């Protein structure tokens, strides 16, 4: 997601902070900003500059300023990936309070910001941005000016932290206490850098790796107060809590630091998938209802929908295939899933009661954008599922669900796919809620089950070592087949696509029931076949049929690699290699069963000596038809 840095020390903060932002550009961003405090030990002046677009835009603004206004030994910096509010100058960080004394930079999502903003507006606070971040700085200023924590900067920040809900990292500076920075984290990362007469905080060690190799990783719900001379770690109540932080020495070089210690960005992004799902879900269940990020459609209009089309390309298309199962099951609406590149050329039947769902990571995919425009011309209602706030597709749609996966550097999609799948569930529940096909308590129960998935995603990722070993064993195979049924079929398609993209191998995904209608002719001795097994609890019939398929291919000499839920002992007899996953409900299985296929493809590519992040002939955002 966003990248942030804080510095207090003896050097000019402007140069230190800007260097840190340049080192964090790899994270991806749509705007940037800096806050500097120049003054004595008792009071100072706060200067803030921020710009949408590339970091060079901010550099140009700073170059035009009087050097004296850039002086100061305390600074905050931020590169933003928009989640609340479009990527504009006024939504860029840092944000200030009304007095212009307190500044904040923020990574993550403040889930209860609508109610907090309403409270502040009633109190007369005027907001200048559309972000959730601005709520935090106004609350701190309010606490600092009056009440029990009046005049106590650290106490004011802690009091506000206790009120915030969500996942966030926040870093505050105050011109009235110019030698102090207060930072805190809940779930999103925050690392402290310990220098000689200077201190740093950052989203990751890339923010300060050129200046110090001594670091402290803050724990959950911890705050830190830093000055040039030292630091103090506490919980949100102000109690000493250094024991729950982790001190470590940074052995990586800068390139490794950018990748979080992983060899490739894609491996880092696979590891980030629990956070991608958490952040996509945050803030979408409020007051007992599923809410969209942007909604220009009334519940009445949603109730009038009588059919749904999902349009997408590549990996997003596979997430759309999964959306079909969810939406049809929960809403009883018919759903068609179309490749965006084919959609507008076949003259689909669309009208005012049609909902077209456009899924795109970048929000700029040319084929998907043209499909959206065709749907709008036919008076259909259009909803976007997108990872990039302010991109073209969301701007042209009637409603938007943002996948808050953050920037994805690897060309092959991983965390954005899981975030899209999570967003599809939210959409299905929102439609079921509007149409009355699920009672409120049923919607809440489904959402709570979805909310528990990130921990299981993390558990699966932690156990992927054997899958990587398996990949090296089959790295020289010429063909790999993938089989699945029901929601396992789109997962099989996605697994095959990943192997094609990354390892340049022939790979095909099939619905297992089609095996006897042709693909079984491909089965030969030692051919690896990966099977995505449904839960025996979800559908005993589907499970039995897929077991029969496995027996068919095994008797013809294929090597079976079976992905099945823990406790499914019936499959052990027919699996040459078994990958076990936690048991979840059928519709949620793709959030787990996709992960081994991502790891398998990346590991095969590594074993074959290919660049996992930059597969040949592919681009991250396809903006031509």
UniProtKB/Swiss-Prot annotation:
Tell me the GO molecular function terms.
carbohydrate derivative binding; glutamine-fructose-6-phosphate transaminase (isomerizing) activity
Name of protein: Glutamine--fructose-6-phosphate aminotransferase [isomerizing]
Q: Which Pfam families match?
A: GATase_6, SIS
Quaternary structure and partners:
Homodimer.
Q: Does the keyword Lyase apply?
A: no
**PROSITE patterns referenced in this protein's UniProt entry, alphabetically:** GATASE_TYPE_2, SIS
Tell me which CDD domains the record gives.
GFAT, SIS_GlmS_GlmD_1, SIS_GlmS_GlmD_2
Record's Gene Ontology CC terms? Answer: cytosol
User: What role does it play?
Assistant: Catalyzes the first step in hexosamine metabolism, converting fructose-6P into glucosamine-6P using glutamine as a nitrogen source.
Q: What is its main location?
A: cytoplasm
Q: Where is the SIS domain?
A: 298-437, 470-615
> Which GO biological process categories is it annotated with?
carbohydrate metabolic process; fructose 6-phosphate metabolic process; protein N-linked glycosylation; UDP-N-acetylglucosamine metabolic process
Q: Where in the cell is it found?
A: Cytoplasm
Taking the record's annotation, the residue ranges forming a coiled coil are none
InterPro entries in the record: GATase_2_dom (IPR017932), GFAT (IPR005855), GFAT_N (IPR047084), GlmS/AgaS_SIS (IPR035466), GlmS/FrlB_SIS (IPR035490), Ntn_hydrolases_N (IPR029055), SIS_dom (IPR001347), SIS_dom_sf (IPR046348)
> What EC number(s) does this enzyme carry?
2.6.1.16
Catalytic reactions on record: D-fructose 6-phosphate + L-glutamine = D-glucosamine 6-phosphate + L-glutamate
Cited NCBIfam families: glmS, PRK00331.1
């Amino acid at each position: 997601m966003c990248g942030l840095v804080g510095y207090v020390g003896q050097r000019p903060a402007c140069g230190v902070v800007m260097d840190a932002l340049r080192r964090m550009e790899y994270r991806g961003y749509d705007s940037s900003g800096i806050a500097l405090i120049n003054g004595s030990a008792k009071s100072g002046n706060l200067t803030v500059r921020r710009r949408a677009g590339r970091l060079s835009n901010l550099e140009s603004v700073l170059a035009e300023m009087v050097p004296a206004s850039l002086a100061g030994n305390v600074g905050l910096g931020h590169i933003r990936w928009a989640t609340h509010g479009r990527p504009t100058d006024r939504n860029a960080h840092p944000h200030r309070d009304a007095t212009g004394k307190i500044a904040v930079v923020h990574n993550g999502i403040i889930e209860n910001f609508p109610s907090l903003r309403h409270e502040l507006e009633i109190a007369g606070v005027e907001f200048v941005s559309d972000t959730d971040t601005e709520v935090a700085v106004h609350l701190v200023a309010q606490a600092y000016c009056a009440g029990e924590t009046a005049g106590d900067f650290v106490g004011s920040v802690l009091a506000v932290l206790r009120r915030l809900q969500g996942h966030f990292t926040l870093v505050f500076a105050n011109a009235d206490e110019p030698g102090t920075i207060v930072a805190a984290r809940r779930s999103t990362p925050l690392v402290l850098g310990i220098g000689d007469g200077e201190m740093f905080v950052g989203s990751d060690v890339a923010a300060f790796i050129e200046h110090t190799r001594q670091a402290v990783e803050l724990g959950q719900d911890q705050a830190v107060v830093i000055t040039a001379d030292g630091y103090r770690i506490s919980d949100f109540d102000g109690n000493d809590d250094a024991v729950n932080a982790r001190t470590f020495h940074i052995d990586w070089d800068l390139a490794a630091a950018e990748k979080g210690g992983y060899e490739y960005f894609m491996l880092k992004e696979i590891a980030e998938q629990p956070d991608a799902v958490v952040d996509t879900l945050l803030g979408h269940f409020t007051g007992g209802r599923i809410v969209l990020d942007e909604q220009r459609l009334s519940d009445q209009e949603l109730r009038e929908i009588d059919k749904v089309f999902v349009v997408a390309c590549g990996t997003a298309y596979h997430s759309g295939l999964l959306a079909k199962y969810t939406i049809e099951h929960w809403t009883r609406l018919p759903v068609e899933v179309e490749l965006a590149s084919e959609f507008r050329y076949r003259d689909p039947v669309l009208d005012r009661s049609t909902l077209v769902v456009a899924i795109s990571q970048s929000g700029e995919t040319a084929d998907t954008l043209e499909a959206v425009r065709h749907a709008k011309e036919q008076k259909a209602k259009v909803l976007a599922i997108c990872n990039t706030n302010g991109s073209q597709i969301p701007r042209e749609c009637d409603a938007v669900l943002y996948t808050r996966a953050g920037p994805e550097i690897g060309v092959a999609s991983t965390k954005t796919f899981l975030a899209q799948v999570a967003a599809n569930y939210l959409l299905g529940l929102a439609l079921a809620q509007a149409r009355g096909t699920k009672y409120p308590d049923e919607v809440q129960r489904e959402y709570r089950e979805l909310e528990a998935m990130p921990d299981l995603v993390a558990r699966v990722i932690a156990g992927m070592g054997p899958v990587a070993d398996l990949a090296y064993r089959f790295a020289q195979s010429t063909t790999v087949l993938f089989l699945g049924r029901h929601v396992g079929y789109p997962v099989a398609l996605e697994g095959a696509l990943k192997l094609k993209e990354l390892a340049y191998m022939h790979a095909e995904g099939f619905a297992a029931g089609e095996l006897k209608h042709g693909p079984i002719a491909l089965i030969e001795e030692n051919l690896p076949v990966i099977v995505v097994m449904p839960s025996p609890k979800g559908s005993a019939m589907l499970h039995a049929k897929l077991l029969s398929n496995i027996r068919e291919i095994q008797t013809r000499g294929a090597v079976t690699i079976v992905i099945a839920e823990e406790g499914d002992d019936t499959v052990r007899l027919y699996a040459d290699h078994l990958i076990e996953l936690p048991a979840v409900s059928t519709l949620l299985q793709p959030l787990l069963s996709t992960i081994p296929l991502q790891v398998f493809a990346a590991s095969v590519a590594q074993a074959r000596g290919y660049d996992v992040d930059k597969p040949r002939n592919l681009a991250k955002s396809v903006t031509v038809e």
